[in-house]
């Protein structure tokens, strides 16, 4: 288990320096840049770097951490932490293991044949499709970060898959709440939807587009990979005992 006493670390409350550290160790398309940036700098608290690892702390309505590398500094303030490529077992410092999710991303471009996406504005219909086909979706109508809902249809004209294009407070563009109607699964509609959102994000000026998906959702991961998205990181969420998101 990592222990901040085992290795010396540097820390900073300077966001620009912190993102520089992240880029040096993790590359341009990385988790930290999706969650914190100059656009939501007021949420950034502190970052920590060791010889081989990086971690940071931010305010998400609770004290939220991210940790990357084999020996990251653990901030004792963390109530929840996402650990990349976790090998730490059931406990991570004072936190306990909860669940796993993966992040994917792509440099946007307009994809020939997928230049447009149909906008969906019927919020009652959107909620119905989510409730019936993806009830654990993180984004529902009314979320202020939504830029638009989009859909694709089958040959009969029926809606087959929906999703939301979202811009987080960090400025990151993200696809959220992708739901394929159960009878239409396995036919490539989620891949088509993703390609159309990649084009749309490019048209809106986004350089990159990301998404999060449950580590167990193999079918969805394959759909995103077929659309050209690459894995950024596999995360394990750790929670402070008794923690409940506000």
Predicted regions: what is each one?
Residues 138-149, 153-156, 160-181:
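A conserved beta-strand-loop-helix scaffold within acyl/acetyltransferase catalytic domains
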Residues 95-107, 230-245:
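Conserved catalytic-core motifs of GNAT/GCN5-like acyltransferases
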Residues 1-89, 127-129:
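N-terminal charged segments
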Residues 84-89, 211-221, 237-245:
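Conserved beta-strand-loop-alpha-helix junction that forms the acyl-donor binding cleft
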Residues 114-151, 176:
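Eukaryotic intrinsically disordered, low-complexity regions
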Residues 1-13, 96-121:
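Conserved N-terminal entry element of GNAT/NAT acetyltransferase domains
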Residues 71-78, 180, 186-203, 221-226:
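Conserved acetyl-CoA-binding loop-helix of GNAT-fold acetyltransferases
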Residues 52, 206-208:
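Short, high-confidence coil segments that cap the C-terminus of an alpha-helix
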